């Protein structure tokens, strides 16, 4: 455990270093810390011995080590902080016409990446928590059809498929009837369970040959189990990490798994400093924040960047964008649930 003065010194070094990326000397600290230069140097030496500071090769100053940044995050960083100077810029950036949910999530991801220079990832509500509230099959031709699904009464999912060779029109009708009777109004996690247990037994009552029918069920509903992921600023990762991080960001489903694992049960926000279980994220910092998607649940807003990022401003931007996005989504869903009319 460090003393209060040592804590103040560490906090100030973190603040100055993240702004200038230059080693910090005792003279710069003396302007804020009410102690002699010798006392400050002594405390800096103790912080270095504890592994919280590192000596610069080109000067007598010190800079935070990864452990120092982690200590700062765990003991001094407020995860709910907001810098009012950024509010106007975020609100202005959100001033656009959105025609669907994905437009807003993609825009929010781009705004965060552009304002930080890092990499932003946004996840929709966790697939398992979504509910199938609508289902239809539209035959496009003699050989293909379109499954049209609605999640949470608002999110459309479409899957085009080739009609099995032995299918007749009545078979498509039976397929739709089974979905409506057994899967409609179920959560996605329950649908996953029923496809393995209940549906194979039900299909036997309607179809003589069941293999291609069960494959069709798997194909149509596999889309529901995938995360909806929006990544922005992927190229930025090359400025603060190596190629492995850049390549990892291409695997959106694995990215989603890693980010969800960064939050403990019941947590609304977290900051990991070189602490991810994912090897490609082991040498970067990951800020993760839940934001409300009205009527549906929580999405995830994440920022991936260097260990020496400006944590106060990054946390502030994540919080502001999360709040503005939630407000915009609230307006969007209220509009969807209202009576539509045209104003002349």
UniProtKB/Swiss-Prot annotation:
Gene3D superfamilies attached to this UniProt entry: 3.30.450.40, Heat-inducible transcription repressor hrca homolog, domain 3, Winged helix-like DNA-binding domain superfamily/Winged helix DNA-binding domain
Keyword field contains Transcription: yes
Record-linked InterPro entries: GAF-like_dom_sf, HrcA, HrcA_C, WH-like_DNA-bd_sf, WH_DNA-bd_sf, WHTH_HrcA_DNA-bd, WHTH_transcript_rep_HrcA_IDD
Molecular function (Gene Ontology), one example: DNA binding
Keywords (A to Z) from UniProt: Repressor, Stress response, Transcription, Transcription regulation
Spans traversing the lipid bilayer: none
Biological processes, Gene Ontology terms: negative regulation of DNA-templated transcription
Organism domain of life: Bacteria
Role played: Negative regulator of class I heat shock genes (grpE-dnaK-dnaJ and groELS operons). Prevents heat-shock induction of these operons.
NCBIfam families registered for this protein in UniProt: hrcA
Family annotation (PANTHER family): HEAT-INDUCIBLE TRANSCRIPTION REPRESSOR HRCA
Family in the record: Belongs to the HrcA family.
Protein name per UniProt: Heat-inducible transcription repressor HrcA
């Amino acid at each position: 455990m460090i003393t209060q003065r040592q804590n103040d010194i560490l906090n100030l070094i973190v603040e100055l270093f993240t702004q200038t990326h230059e080693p910090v000397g005792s003279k710069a600290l003396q302007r804020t810390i009410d102690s002699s230069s010798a006392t400050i140097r002594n405390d800096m030496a103790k912080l270095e011995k504890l592994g919280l500071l590192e000596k610069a090769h080109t000067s007598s100053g010190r800079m935070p080590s990864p452990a120092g940044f982690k200590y700062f995050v765990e003991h001094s960083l407020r995860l709910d902080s907001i810098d009012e100077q950024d509010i106007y810029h975020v609100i202005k950036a959100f001033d656009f016409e959105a025609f669907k949910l994905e437009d807003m999530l993609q825009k929010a991801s781009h705004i965060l990446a552009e304002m930080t220079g890092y990499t932003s990832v946004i996840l929709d509500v966790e697939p398992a928590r979504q509910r199938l509230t609508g289902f239809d099959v539209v035959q496009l031709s003699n050989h293909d059809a379109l499954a049209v699904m609605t999640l949470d009464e608002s999110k459309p999912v479409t899957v085009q498929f080739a009609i099995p060779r032995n299918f007749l029109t009545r078979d498509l009708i039976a397929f739709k009837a089974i979905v409506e009777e057994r899967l409609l109004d179920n959560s996605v996690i329950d649908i996953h369970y029923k496809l393995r247990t209940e549906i194979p037994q039900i299909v036997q009552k309607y179809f003589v040959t069941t293999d291609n029918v069960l494959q069709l069920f798997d194909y149509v509903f596999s889309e529901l189990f995938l995360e909806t992921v929006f990544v922005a600023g992927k190229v930025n990762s090359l400025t603060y990490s190596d190629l492995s991080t850049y390549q990892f960001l291409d695997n959106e489903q694995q990215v989603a798994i890693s980010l969800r694992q960064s939050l403990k049960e019941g947590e609304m926000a977290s900051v990991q400093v070189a602490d991810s279980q994912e090897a490609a994220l082991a040498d970067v910092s990951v800020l993760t924040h839940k934001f409300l998607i009205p009527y549906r649940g929580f999405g995830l807003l994440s920022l991936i960047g260097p260990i020496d990022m400006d944590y106060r401003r990054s946390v502030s931007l994540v919080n502001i964008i999360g709040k503005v996005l939630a407000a915009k989504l609230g307006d969007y869903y209220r509009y969807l649930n209202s009576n539509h009319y045209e104003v002349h």
